[in-house]
Amino acid sequence: MKSIRVLMVLDTMDVSGTETHVLSLVKELQSRGIYTAVVTGNGSMISRLRKTGCKIHQMNFPKTLTINSEAESLLLNSLVDLLRKEQISLVHGHQITSGNIAAKAAKLSNIPFIFTLHGTYFPKSDIKSVLRITDAAVAVSEPVKKHIQPFFPKNISIIANGIDTTDFSPSPSLELREKMNIPPKAKVILYCSRITRHKARICMLLIKACRDLKKDIPNLHVIIVGNGSQLKDIKNMAASIHSSCKEEFIHFTGEQQNVKDYYALADYVVGTGRVALEAMACERPVISCGNLGYFGEVNSNNFQQAWECYFGDHAAKQASSQAIIYRDLRNLHQSSIGVPTGRELRKLVLEHFDSKKIILPLIELYESTIQSFEQQQAIN
């Protein structure tokens, strides 16, 4: 088999789990001598992508699948030309709109297309549109696999988001504490997410829970990392809480590319999906809740269950609520098991989610997909 040349395709390079995942894939593929290029729109993570040394091609993808034929034709021609110039042997899409265009370009270029679905929150009709022209599908969790199985008759590979455990590892936080005017002995709860829709609601529930938790933990501080359309509403709520508590203890950092520094600062992290995994890699205790509901404290005994629902982001048995978040954070604080639990969680992430291990089944899928595609072409 000839050497593999991969083109990764994303809508944009904004700061979020999917883009961070692709960044880690690019690093790992290149470290193994696999040529990897990326085509994407704008985004604040472009600078980090450039540092990997990969070839970056910027393209303005539509925001929805609905696009006029002239605009689609221009995009397709540009992509087909790019695939030819880069001598790409496999295209890997990660988001619906760019993935749909890329899959069509791959078909026109007689190149196999792989699509990774990163969540269950996309319209089923959009998922179907991409999967019907996909040669191999990847789900990042078991619930995502179940979600797309009715639309894809072939085998679906489960390949989790890999974590760069060298980058995400325990580190000191005194300098950042001083910068944010957080006392050395203060207890810090961190929430990291885009502040939109379900994730914004979780943020509101957390802030309300922390208002009550402040009575139990007088030296409590809360850090909210992320931007989004509902950030203003969250800030207004925080201002009201500060007024009633007569103390400003909720901090907003906006979007951060080096979120690992904030994990290091936190005693506890509330999050889901990739945030939960990154925090655990940094030895931080995690309360997981996501798009589909609440899981709770993650520990070595329930780690497998937490992974199976992707830490509340792709499945859940109960809804998130202010009362349950308050209860679990208070119990976690009173148990004083943060440090040993954090160490156990990092070991589990190293064992199951290290990007250096996760990349291996993906490379195998690349090789088998190209081989199957070429065999089918020979028959036809």
Residue spans of the language-model regions?
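A charged, aromatic-enriched C-terminal amphipathic alpha-helix characteristic of glycosyltransferases
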Residues: 17, 316-367
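N-terminal strand-loop element at the rim of the active site
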Residues: 3, 8-16, 20-22, 27-70, ...
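Donor nucleotide-sugar binding/catalytic pocket of nucleotide-sugar-dependent glycosyltransferases
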Residues: 134-170
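Nucleotide-activated donor-binding/catalytic signature segment of Leloir-type glycosyltransferases, i.e.
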Residues: 225, 234-256
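Short His-centered aromatic/hydrophobic patch
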Residues: 93-99, 117
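A short helix/loop element that forms part of the nucleotide-sugar donor recognition site in Leloir-type
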Residues: 78, 169-182
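Conserved donor-binding/catalytic core segment of Leloir-type glycosyltransferases
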Residues: 7, 182-203, 207-210, 223
